[in-house]
Each structure stands twice: as C-alpha cells, then as structure tokens.
C-alpha cells in the first residue's frame, strides 16, 4: 500500500490540472456590453465627477404692463391688475426676443467682456470654442443664446430671466444688464408710440393755425379796404344817427307848423324850412349808406363781410377743436405707456445649478443599458434568422 500512494497522488494532480479554470465576471462580459454600458458610464463618471465645470444661474423676474382697462386674472396676475395696470403680453414677448437677439448681445459687449466670460473659463466641453475649431461670431451668438433663457407665465404675466455662466457674479452682471436693456427698449417703444399718436394731431393743429392766420388776414384786409371794422356796430351807429335826425326833423316840422299857424310871415320860417330840408337830405344820405345800391353801402358790404367774418370764426373754432384733440391724443398716449417692473432682482447664486452630476452619470448608465438590450435583441434575432 505504501508503494501505491505516490502513484495515486500523481494521478490526482494530473486530473486537477486538466480541469478548466473559472473565468472572472469581468471577462464574461461581452464586448457589446463594454462598448454600450461600461465605457460610456466610466467616461461619464470621470468627466462629471472630476472635470465638468460648475455653472451658476442668476435668476430675475419682471413684468411689462400698461395702465389700460383691467381684465379678470387669478393669483399674482390679479394682484398686479389691482394696482391699476394691465398686462401687455405682445410687448413682453418683444422684450424677451430682444434680450436674446444679436442687437442685445452687441450692446452687452460694449459694457461687459461677455465672450471672455464664456471662452476663457470652464472645461473644454462646456466653454465656448473649447477645442479652437469654431471661433466665429455667429457660433458665439448661438452659444450665448443657450445661456440666456426667458420663461413667460401666461397666467400671472410674469417673465423669468435665467442667465448661466461659469461665475456667479458674472451671471448676475449679465442679468442686470439685460434688464436695463429691456427697460430701455420699453422706453424706446413708448417714445415711438407717443410720437406716432401725437404727430397727426400736431399736424392738424398746425394746419388749423395756418387757416386762422389766413382768415384773420383776409378779414383785416377787407376792413382796411372798405373802412369797415365792425359792420354790426357801424350799422347800429348809423341807424341811431338816422333815428336822431328823424326825431330832430319831427321837432322842426312841429315848430314850423306852429309858427305858420300863428304868424305866417314870421322871419323864422325860412330858417326852419332850410333846416328841414337839410335834415331830410342828411336822412336820405344815411339811409342810402345803409341800404342804398352803391358798392360802399352797408347792405351791399354785409354779405361779403359776413362771409369773411364767418371764415375767420370757423377757422378759430377748428383750431380750438384741433387743440382739444391734441390734448386728448397726449392723454391717450400717456395712458398707453408701457412699464417694465422688476418683480425680483437678479440673484447671486452661491450653489451651482449645473451640471447635475449624479443625474447625468445615472442617465448615461440607464441609456447604455437600454442600448445594450436593444442591440442584444437585434443580434440574437439576426443569429436566429441565420440558423
């Protein structure tokens, strides 16, 4: 028995050598799983865990409104309406689009080194032109638009402005500058609308004033040419003079009749008769001046004078109406003025809102597993089809 032991041990050792070694679980993973799940997840873990730069978002909110008639709203919108203002939704969209426009960016770059904010900070994947391939202005504008977001709440009428950059203070500065630009745009819209509203009324006033000047000059020229300054007053004066002459004529006739009756040969009779003839002549002249057929008679001048006078009066009334319309236009323009009210000032964030590191890593893992599952099913289906 002692001689057989070495043989048995040798046989057992040889059998153990023939057994295959167990593969580790890592080696059991298919290349497809490595490509779709492990490698992307590791890259995501390394990037978001160690290299991805923090990005800070400064937030502010504002509303554009005008003192128009109120409408029924709920919540904060009703509170804003209670102050006597109505929302100007069309204009708030205009302000929002302007804040993200090239014109706004050009104005912003005059006071802040915006491109430097986004080109010299942050990791290569996050900052603008991180690999030096696209440095055009159009490329920077498209990048910048993704850093400025505006959300509009149709219920309350409030817009929220979010500006993201790699530095909290820089985000706040850009946000503040954009709010000032929005306010400047509103003032520009107000000035233009007011000018358009008032311009027509001012032109009407100018035209009416020219008509008054022309009509007044025509009336003055007519008065000077015809010696008539107030036809009605002059007619009243002449009629009063005729009345006095007629009264005096009656007195003279009475005296003359009395003298003739008492003393027919009285020497006063010729004088009274001469005075009677003189009065009759004067009365006839005055009556002809008032209603005679001559061109200079008041009756003939009345129609022309009345026309010129009425033209002057009408022109003055039109001027007064135009002035009233101008004042009404100014009041209406003031009533339609727009106002940009800042609800909350730009914040100075002390916590980075982006990137969402854990979320991105987990999302990469889940997406990789989904892709792996789909590709595995496709591969198995193809193999089964071939078999």
From Swiss-Prot:
Q: Which InterPro entries match?
A: Bact_polysacc_biosynth/exp, BexC_CtrB_KpsE_VexD
Q: From the UniProt record, which GO molecular function terms apply? A: carbohydrate:proton symporter activity; protein tyrosine kinase activity
List, in alphabetical order, the GO biological process terms annotated in this UniProt record. polysaccharide transport
Chain ranges passing through the membrane: 32-52, 358-378
Membrane topology per the entry is: Multi-pass membrane protein
The main location class comes to membrane
Q: Where in the cell is it found?
A: Cell inner membrane
Keyword hit for Membrane: yes
CC annotations in GO: Gram-negative-bacterium-type cell wall; plasma membrane
> What UniProt keywords apply to this chain's record, in alphabetical order?
Capsule biogenesis/degradation, Cell inner membrane, Cell membrane, Membrane, Polysaccharide transport, Sugar transport, Transmembrane, Transmembrane helix, Transport
What does this gene product do? May form an ATP-driven capsule polysaccharide export apparatus, in association with the CtrC and CtrD proteins.
As for family, the record states: Belongs to the BexC/CtrB/KpsE family.
The name this protein carries in UniProt is Capsule polysaccharide export inner-membrane protein CtrB
